Amino acid sequence: MKKNILLLFLVHGANYLFPFIVLPYQTRILSIETFADVAKIQAAVMLLSLIVNYGYNLSSTRAIARAVSQAEINKIYSETLIVKLLLATICLALGCVHLMYVKEYSLIYPFIISSIYLYGSALFATWLFQGLEKMKAVVIATTIAKLTGVILTFILVKSPNDIVAALFTQNIGMFISGIISIYLVRKNKYATVICFRLKNIIVSLKEAWPFFLSLAATSVYTYFNVILLSFYAGDYVVANFNAADKLRMAAQGLLIPIGQAVFPRLSKLEGYEYSSKLKIYAIRYAIFGVCISAGLVFLGPMLTTIYLGKEYSLSGEYLQSMFLLPATISISTILSQWMLIPQGKEKILSRIYILGAIVHLLYAFPLVYYYGAWGMVISILFTEVLIVLFMLKAVK
């Protein structure tokens, strides 16, 4: 498992390190207005990608890990791949219809360009590689793709209004990852696309539904925040908040590879072996989350000033105020992915996330209306803590 954790660190290192390199270039080249528009479109694409993934990144990972034959793996792979491609097409259509409805015609073409992320997400079989514990393939695909996106950013993004180029370079990496993923699956014969039945697809959708509800609910207090903030705040505030949130997510992203590597391992264990391993992993994971939070407190303002430039001076204050999030998220991951899901309590987890999303919206709108980005920070923190409390009650 240590090897898989290391490989997942490399994957998420590529996911966060390369954009981390690009971000200061974009904040200095793009105008505040363009950077804010990029943030809004990218947030919308991330929301739609949750529909594309539809919880399969967890349900299919677990199914692959428990599969007892190659035929079963082929069946899971085929059904998941086809459904995700169909969902990507539906999301593209819905996004275009929405932009036409709100008369944001100038953003339709940039959105279509950004939708390559949706198809890349559909093709990129991370769930297959995780279930098989073959993470080397993911590292190869992600590293090549992200590096390509970085190089293209410095080549194509040249003027303050290069919104299409900025969005293309941000999203092409996922599409390339998807293509490489398909190639590696075929080359190494990890799985084969076979004929499938509509009945089986419906069953797989039902199995992934609780995971989807959980992810969709969490998106309300993650990706939707930038969109909500744009309703009440100007481009300057939106751009600064988005930049701070990207840095916070990059720091918080250090937790993801450990969480993903431990999840399939714990899913296979039962009884005393499960309990003893869980205790060891949980203590170390929580300590790591606290260390990341401490880093935001002491290094946040200094990093943003050097990294983003003087125009983004507010970002440092926003980032520092989010310091509790990494520690809280580490506890949330332990309770949800390592405890509730392996115990078969997916429905309870879904209800917790849905309740958290509903409550979040109740106070997020008025707080953002009166206090802008500070109201958003307060809303996010309160929601994450509230969800952890709900989870603690559920695992007892």
Curated annotation (Swiss-Prot):
It is found in: Cell inner membrane. GO terms for cellular component: plasma membrane. It is a multi-pass membrane protein. Pathway: Bacterial outer membrane biogenesis; LPS O-antigen biosynthesis. Keywords: Cell inner membrane, Cell membrane, Lipopolysaccharide biosynthesis, Membrane, Transmembrane, Transmembrane helix, Transport. It comes from the Bacteria. The chain crosses the membrane at residues 5-25, 32-52, 82-102, 107-127, 137-157, 163-183, 211-231, 286-306, 322-342, 348-368, 372-392. GO terms for biological process: O antigen biosynthetic process. Pfam families: Polysacc_synt (PF01943). May be involved in the translocation process of the nascent O-polysaccharide molecules and/or its ligation to lipid A core units. Belongs to the polysaccharide synthase family. This is Putative O-antigen transporter.
